[in-house]
C-alpha cells in the first residue's frame, strides 16, 4: 500500500502546497481521498489517469476539500473513463454532487453532443453517504470510516485503510478527538492535519484574533498533535493540511517530537510513502 500526498495545503492558495487530497494505491486499487485545488494536475504529474481511479472518498464538504470535484469528473471523461464514478462521503454529498452537475449541465451536454466521444459513463455518479461508522471493501482494500470532530461542520470523517496486514489512518479535518485516537490505535502510519501555533498573525479587521481563535478551535494545534500520535501509538506520524502553509519546519518538528517521542514527517506535495 502506498500513500501519495497530492495536496498538503489549506484554503489559502500556495504554489507549493495544493489543496487537500491524497492517493492510496495498491497493486490493484486506486482510491482518492478529497479533491482539493490542483488535484488533477498532481495526478497528471504522477502519470495517474483520472480514468483509473476506483473511488473518491470525501472527509467532509468544506470547499478546500471538494473545490476541484467537477474538474476531476470532466477530466476523467477527457481521459476516456469508461466506468461510472463511485463517491463516498458525508450526509450532504448527494445534494452537493447533484448541484455541481446541474450547474455545468448545459455546457456538458453541448460538449457531449458536439465532441461525440464514445462513452459518457464518467458522468454516471453513484454516491454513498456515510453513517457514523462502517466498512467498505473495494478490491484489495478495506476502508473503515469513523466520525471526527470538526464542529461546526456537522459531518466529518477519518478513514482507516487496510491492506496485507498494514493500516493507514487519515484524520481528515478535526480538533483533538478521542474517536480518532481510538480508531488510529497502532496504525502503521497516521496522516494528521495540523494548525501551527504562533505562525499566523492577526491583520487588522481582515484576520482578527477572534478569527484565528475560531480557526484553531476546529483544527488540531501543533502543541497537541504529538500527544494525539502518542496516545494513538502510531508507528509513523505524517503531518499535512498545514495552517499556515509557510512555517518554521525545525520548530514544528521540535514541538511535535517533544510529545510524540519521535520526529514527525513533514508532508509535502507528491511525497510517496510505502506502508
Regions found by a protein language model. Name each.
Residues 1-180, 251-274:
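Binuclear metal-dependent hydrolase catalytic cores
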Residues 165-169, 175-271:
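Cap/insert and terminal regions of metallo-dependent hydrolase folds
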Amino acid at each position: 500500500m502506498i500513500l501519495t500526498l497530492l495536496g498538503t495545503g489549506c484554503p489559502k492558495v500556495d504554489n507549493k502546497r495544493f489543496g487537500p487530497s491524497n492517493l492510496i494505491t495498491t497493486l490493484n486499487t486506486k482510491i482518492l481521498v478529497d479533491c482539493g485545488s490542483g488535484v488533477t494536475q498532481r495526478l497528471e504529474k504522477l502519470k495517474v489517469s483520472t480514468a483509473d481511479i476506483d473511488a473518491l472518498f470525501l472527509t467532509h464538504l468544506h470547499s478546500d476539500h471538494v473545490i476541484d470535484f467537477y474538474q476531476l469528473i470532466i477530466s476523467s471523461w477527457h481521459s476516456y473513463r469508461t466506468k461510472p464514478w463511485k463517491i463516498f462521503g458525508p450526509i450532504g454529498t448527494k445534494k452537493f454532487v447533484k448541484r455541481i452537475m446541474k450547474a455545468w449541465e448545459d455546457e456538458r451536454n453541448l460538449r457531449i453532443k458536439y465532441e461525440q466521444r464514445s462513452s459518457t459513463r464518467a458522468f454516471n455518479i453513484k454516491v454513498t453517504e456515510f453513517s457514523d461508522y462502517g466498512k467498505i471493501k473495494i478490491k484489495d482494500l478495506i476502508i473503515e470510516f469513523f466520525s471526527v470532530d470538526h464542529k461546526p461542520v456537522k459531518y466529518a470523517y477519518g478513514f482507516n485503510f487496510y491492506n496485507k496486514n498494514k493500516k493507514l489512518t487519515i484524520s481528515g479535518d478535526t480538533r483533538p478527538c478521542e474517536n480518532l485516537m481510538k480508531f488510529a490505535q497502532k496504525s502503521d502510519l497516521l496522516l494528521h492535519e495540523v494548525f501551527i501555533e504562533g505562525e499566523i498573525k492577526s491583520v487588522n479587521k481582515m484576520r482578527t484574533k477572534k478569527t484565528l481563535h475560531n480557526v484553531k478551535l476546529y483544527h488540531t494545534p501543533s502543541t497537541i498533535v504529538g500527544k494525539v500520535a502518542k496516545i494513538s501509538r502510531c508507528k509513523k506520524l505524517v503531518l499535512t493540511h498545514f495552517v499556515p502553509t509557510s512555517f518554521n519546519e525545525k520548530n514544528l518538528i521540535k514541538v511535535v517530537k517533544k510529545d510524540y517521542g519521535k520526529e514527525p514527517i513533514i508532508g509535502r506535495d507528491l511525497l510517496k510513502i510505502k506502508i
